[in-house]
From Swiss-Prot:
The lineage of its organism: Eukaryota, Viridiplantae, Streptophyta, Embryophyta, Tracheophyta. The keyword DNA damage does not apply. InterPro entries: ARD, ARD_euk, RmlC-like_jellyroll, RmlC_Cupin_sf. Its cofactor is Fe(2+); Ni(2+). It is an enzyme of class 1 (oxidoreductase). Its main location: cytoplasm. This is Acireductone dioxygenase 1. Keywords: Amino-acid biosynthesis, Cytoplasm, Dioxygenase, Iron, Metal-binding, Methionine biosynthesis, Nickel, Nucleus, Oxidoreductase.
Length: 188
């Protein structure tokens, strides 16, 4: 089943904050994202401090560090420059875990054929991008998102811009996606 918050992107030079749907639109299912190692949950952002499901996810996956990040022109110095940095294609050596508490934005991930898939995260969406997946982030035209960032251990957010085919996390990701190793915690 396809959802209306993930789709194959039309690549062009228009504003990165636009949806960039193909014509006709080509939506992507949660199962397709899961095949790429991307996990998704729909949670209650209004009571995240007491959310039992969030607590269980954090405990089972070892997410013991959390902080909050507000992204909007009024709160981020050099906003346009930061947005350009987030939109540069990169990988991380660790998972990227983001929970959208307010607002919305887009995570773009590369599929197995190197096509961009745009994932629209909105209030209540929690997404986990596996270590080694090529991706980027931008806000949508609302220009605001409040994200919870989750980490295993001390927060490390080092971006390695493409190409990174020899990076250990990238090699491991390719191996896992190719051989479908491991069974992730069930996401919905």
């Amino acid at each position: 089943m396809a959802i209306e918050q993930a789709w194959f992107m039309e690549e062009n030079d228009e504003d990165q904050r636009l949806p960039h749907h193909r014509n006709p639109k080509q939506f992507v299912s949660l199962d397709h994202l899961a095949d790429l190692g991307v996990l998704y949950w729909k949670l209650n952002p209004k009571d995240y401090e007491n959310d039992q499901e969030l607590k269980e996810i954090r405990e089972s996956r070892g997410y013991n560090y959390m902080d909050l990040l507000d992204l909007c022109p009024e709160r981020v110095e050099n906003y346009e420059e930061k947005l350009k940095n987030f939109y540069t294609e990169h990988i991380h050596g660790d998972e990227e875990i983001r929970y959208c508490l307010e607002g919305s934005g887009y995570f773009d991930v590369r599929d197995k054929e190197d096509r961009w898939i745009r994932i629209w995260i909105k209030e209540g969406d929690m997404i986990v991008l596996p270590a080694g997946i090529y991706h980027r982030f931008t806000l949508d035209t609302g220009n605001y998102v409040k994200l919870m960032r989750l980490f295993v251990g001390e927060p490390v957010w080092t971006a390695y811009n493409r190409p990174q085919e020899h990076h250990p996390a990238r090699k491991n990701y390719i191996n896992n996606v190719t051989h479908k190793v491991g069974v992730p915690l069930e996401a919905h």
